[in-house]
């Protein structure tokens, strides 16, 4: 019986009493019908009634406990939700605090950087203030010096005015002297004009004389060749030596005069270029001496630039002098060759009095020699001309 009650009324943890179904009246009747011989002892005894009432009270308590348990579960769920919300709010608050802390650290760093920059600016401003103080002191000193210089200039101006007054007096005297000199110059110009007129007349007379001489030479050229041959025909053995000597005497100054004049002009040009080089050396030394003296930096830079330009000019001048010396040597060698050739030609003419072979072998040479003997000072060797043109074109480079 206890087991049946325990199974029917009490229930278990898995099957609580509120979920158990009590047997209804029909079920009890069916049960009684199934067991008709058994009397209902359970409902008749007082203990059973007490037990049923106890079970009812117990069932009520179990219901209450179940209600409390459900309420407790609801409260627990509510508390868990509130705890989750609180945790979330706490996390958000901590995140906000962390962000605020980081922002505060960043602001502190920015403030420290600004403070360091402000300190550096303060140091720079202090230095600038010190520099401005020094500048003000220097300006005051310069102001005092300028005032002193102005006073000195005023005194010098007064002295200059006195000197100017004296110079004006001298200028007045010089003007009088100038007027006198202009009068004398006018008279001298009149005399010069007279002399120029006389010179013009003399030039006119000289031209007339030259025209007459040209007419006479033309008349001599127009004479027939027989008369000229008759005039100049002489014995060959008597006239050959004088003709050669005179022609040689004429040809030697003509042939040697041009190279000698070229050599003289080259030597004069070389001397002038060497004098210019010496002058450049003196200027170079003077500029070096100026650079050694303490002075302004810009002036020293200008002097250095002048030194560089002067050094380049000296180098070019040295190259020109060396080239000119080489050409002077070549001209001398050429002159020696020409003289040797002239000597050989003259010795060949003297050694062959008949001159038949030379005339046969080189008729042009003989014709050129005879024509050169008959010319005046218009003879110029071809080699000297070529050398002169080469020297003028290529090697003499004048500085601009």
Curated annotation (Swiss-Prot):
Residues 47-111, 138-213, 261-345 form a coiled coil. It is found in: Cytoplasm, Cytoskeleton, Microtubule organizing center, Centrosome. Residues 222-261, 314-400 are annotated as: Disordered. The modification Phosphoserine is found at residue 45. InterPro entries: Centrosomal_MT-associated (IPR051756), Cep57_CLD (IPR025913), Cep57_MT-bd_dom (IPR024957). Keywords: Coiled coil, Cytoplasm, Cytoskeleton, Microtubule, Phosphoprotein. Pfam families: Cep57_CLD, Cep57_MT_bd. Residues 244-258 have a biased composition (Polar residues). GO terms for cellular component: centrosome; cytoplasm; microtubule. Residues 314-342, 391-400 have a biased composition (Basic and acidic residues). One of its GO terms (molecular function) is identical protein binding. It comes from the Eukaryota. Belongs to the translokin family. Centrosomal protein which may be required for microtubule attachment to centrosomes. This is Centrosomal protein CEP57L1. It comes from Mus musculus (Mouse).
